[in-house]
Amino acid sequence: MTARKPFWETKSLNQMTVPEWESLCDGCGLCCLVRFEDEDTGEIIPTRVHCQLFDEHRCTCKDYANRKKTVPDCIKLTPHNIETLEWMPPSCAYRRLHEGKTLPLWHPLITGDRESVHQAGVSVRDQTVSELSFSDPEDALDFVATDLMYDKSDVDWDPEEP
């Protein structure tokens, strides 16, 4: 008997069910960071400042179901807008699958462990500050973090080491 391939290898993003789509999120937290766009160059500038609803230790949204009410500019990822979201980190499963790439070895769907993204050092767990810490949103520019946006898909990670 041959093993059945996982859904992310057999379905397009458009064909996935809502639970399948949601399970692609590795929980790194990179998409919950405040970003700026340089008006002259169009360059996206990531920061170590997270959305007010982001739980910096769990790397999850504190009110995912209602997030758009509190944070109207929160972008809901869909199969229809993923190609326009060039600011998504290169290691993001949504972006990788859209680009025809595989999931990284540390991805929770591969490991079966939601902690693997943190153990591999890919997430922003406990490395960010809340946007609520600033009276002026532009102060987030003091926390520019271009280092967070390099491709972490192939990090040297040993699942046996904590």
UniProtKB/Swiss-Prot annotation:
Positions of transmembrane segments: none
InterPro entries (alphabetical): Puta_zinc/iron-chelating_dom, UCP006173
One Pfam family from the record: CxxCxxCC
Signal peptide bounds: none
Residue pairs linked by disulfide bridges in the UniProt entry: none
Family: Belongs to the UPF0260 family.
HAMAP family noted in UniProt: UPF0260 (MF_00676)
Name of protein: UPF0260 protein Caul_3920
Organism annotation: Caulobacter sp. (strain K31)
